[in-house]
Every structure is written in C-alpha cells, then in structure tokens.
Amino acid sequence: IYFNGGGLMAGSGSEPRYAGESMARKGIIAITANYREGIFGFFSHPQLSKETAYKGSGNYGFMDQVAAIQWVKTHIADFGGDPERITIAGESAGSMSVSALMASPLCQGLIAQAIGSSGSVMGFNAVATLKEAETAGVEIAKALGCKTIKQLRAMPAEELMKRANVRNVPKYCIDGYFFTEQPTQTYADGKQLHIPLLIGGNN
C-alpha cells in the first residue's frame, strides 16, 4: 500500500509516478490509498475533540491511512493477496506517514513490513500536543471568520480549502488515539511495530 507525498497538504495516489505497473508485472499487488490532507486531514479544535469518544481531534489523514490498511487486510485475499504480508510504503510525507503508522497502536497486527523514502515523523519538531493543535485550530477558524465547527462545516469544501490556504506541513498531534505519546518516545522504548523496515532517500 503506497501513500503519496506532498507535505500532508497536497498530492494523491492517482499521480502517474505512483502507478504500480512495474510491480504488478512481478506479481506484486500494488495499491495506492488517498487520505485527507490539509485542513481536512489535520485540523484540531476543542469542539471536534468534544465530539469524539477519546476526546481528541486532528489526525484524520493518518486515520484514513489506517482505515485503508484495515480494508486491505480484510479484502486483499479476494484479489489473490496475502493479508499477512501487507507492506506499507511512501515517499516524503508518505514516508513520514509510514513511520507514524509504525508508532501508532492502531496498526498493531496490520502490517508485515514497511518502506520509507525521504521522510520520517521524527525528522521534524516534536509532535504538537492536543492543546497546541486545538489552539492553532481555533486561530485558523477565527481567521476564516468562524467561531464554531458548525460554521466551518457549512462552508463549501472548495472555499474552505482555498481560504484555509495551508502552505506548511499541518499540525498532527498527540490526540490520545492515533498517537498516545511522542513517536520519538515510542521508538526509544521499543514500542513501535517490530517489522522489517527499508529506509532511504530519493530525488
């Protein structure tokens, strides 16, 4: 399963460079999975956190990736694949996602191996706390003239995307669900997925 790059704010699995024909010719089942990006994928707000059972918000793009892996785990045998041999891979933000998924408790038992190229969740600043991400989300909402999540949801998606104008890697956070602690701590304590990992860089 290949996750696209693009700074968690742009890109998709349908880009020609991610086509899997060469792998398919070798008998590999190649899958790309889209995930929410920018304000749709990584936006925290106290009102959103209040809606969830785990009282957190913000890592929707990562949770989309988990859902894609779960779907493949359930259905890949119907396509001739082995649910016990799922490999996740990505470049840039996709590679960062790979290392994030390996640190998430949601991925236990889902993945057999991983490939990351030119990116790691540990290659940036510390992951934002939920409070920090919520505060940033409130400021974004204010800049859009919205005091409530209801107002944001009423805005057409295209308008919201343009007006939010996300131009930097958006704030993912320790939401208590996808991330329960800093990924650096998870890896330091050896609590990440213990699976074969191939890492490197590309151009």
Regions found by a protein language model. Give the residues of each.
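Short, well-ordered surface patches within globular domains
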Residues: 2, 14-18, 22, 149, ...
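Substrate-access "cap/lid" subdomains that shape
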Residues: 74, 108, 113, 117-203
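Mature extracellular/periplasmic domains of secretome proteins
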Residues: 19-24, 102-103, 187
